[in-house]
Amino acid sequence: MLLGLPGHLINDVQAATTTKAVTQGDTLIGADLARNIYDLNGAGITVAVISDSFNCLGGAEIGQANGELPATVTVLKEADCQGEKTLDEGRAMLEVIHDLAPGASLLFHAMGDNPADLTQALNRVADHGAQIIVDDAIYFSEPMFQDGPASQAIDRLVAERGIAVFSSAGNAGLNSYQSVFSDSGTYPLGEKHGVAHDFNPNPRETDTCQTITVGADAFTILSLQWDQPAKSIGGGNGSASDLDVVVYDDPACKRVARTWVIGGSTDNLGGDPVEVVGFDNKGNRHRKTVGLSILKVAGPAPGLLKYILSGSSLPSEHPSIDEYRNAPKTVTSAFGHANAASVFSVGAIEAGHGKKPPAPSYYSSPGGLPVLFDNQGQRLAEPIVRRHVDAVAPTNVNTSFFSKTRPDLEKDGKPNFTGTSAAAPHAAAVAALLLQAEARNGQVLKPIQLYDLLRRSALDMSTPGYDYETGYGLLQPAKAINLLSNDR
């Protein structure tokens, strides 16, 4: 039975028409071995997915008939199914979980449009019995330097209700720029529009124009923030400065873009220190290189400014920062609730498809972003840098339908699910196996214990030891279950 509209069960499941799709991550991390060796399937554990939509495209009933999903999926809230944001990525995440933990009960809740919607979704799935929650939601207005409402909600669920929360790290990769604000002394649009930031680190030269490239046939988002507290979180006075982002049609910053760029000029004084810019390059088969400037319109110069450039995980649609890039090992682009104190943040590695060993995905967002303010907006005596990303899991894996426009890398007729959105549900499913294993012994595995097992058992990748790109390494469920047995 598929729970479609809230409160309505659909019993007429359609006949099976295709062969079941199974994520390559099942064998790559050895979840299949863990199930067989320890006789586990996630039974008795409830896992909730919070994502864009579940069945806006249709086809969930066929997926159930083919064994892609369990007979009952509880949909607490579906998206409104309008626009391009509803791609049923949530159903793809549920398929991945069902592959690794086929006995687990599954819930779904739409992520909504803003962090307040996510907070509501987190609380609602918790109220309906979720023991594990996984989401792939990104809101570009979420604070970078302060814990927002969703981060605080996650901390409460973990501490007060014992619910483990997993979140995708994001797909920005190395596309982040940060710097102290450097006053160029120039006003490219006139004094009333503000003084431009100087991108050039050479004190004898000035450059107020930075080139970036947005993806082909894609929508790209830039979120600029700076080190001042957000009015919407702790109250208080909010941002003391007003910064704007100006985008130009050309890489030399000669012609201001007006028709295909959205946002960038909010009055931030007394509000939140964030400017969000949308680049609509849909319909253009070519990548587009443009220039941008950052202007201080009013208030004191911030001590630190940072933007993250986010887009698709597909190479042709992925954006890039073309000059004045920060050193790779210093880049941080996992932000918002993916950097919450109590979340388990999941990055991505390539499944390989038999052609190469697993390697970190170029778009997987590294962690390490400092928290500078407390929940009341007071600057901390020392920045808090959390060890996120926690671990990595496979991406470019099979589902039955998501997405038909994505590459079929291994040519098996099954589309590949790409991004850290594909990685995160692997972690949630492994967690379900661990919770089931502990429940057999009459014990409840607390989130802090669960996270510790996943970290200690992970297969180290990249540089030796912990790193912000791959965390503690690749998930290893069989080893985690063995550690659980030894720890008793």
Where are these regions (language model features)?
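Loop-rich non-cytosolic ectodomains and luminal regions
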Residues: 2-487
